């Protein structure tokens, strides 16, 4: 369905996804402040995921899976030098942590991890916003 969106609909979807990224970063901060670190890291991942989706949609690139979104980011933006490799690593690591937290047992994120990845996620989303302008 998304593949057939007209230009205006794609622009609206891009805006919606970036707004979701901003909202989700805020959710992550609230969760971290209440010491819900697994949930905070989960929300950091989703904030980045929504931002990446916005970037892909803007360029007419669509994927139905989380792994596909990660692959498309790497293929179309990281490997071409449009997005720094470190941003790609941040997104990949958050993907792994989120996946483990959702599907594996005895996975615990902590304050240090949240404190490390929050500014990385914020910088990553800021970079994507620059590319969307």
Q: What are the functions of these language-model segments?
A:
Residues 1-133:
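Terminal alpha-helical segments
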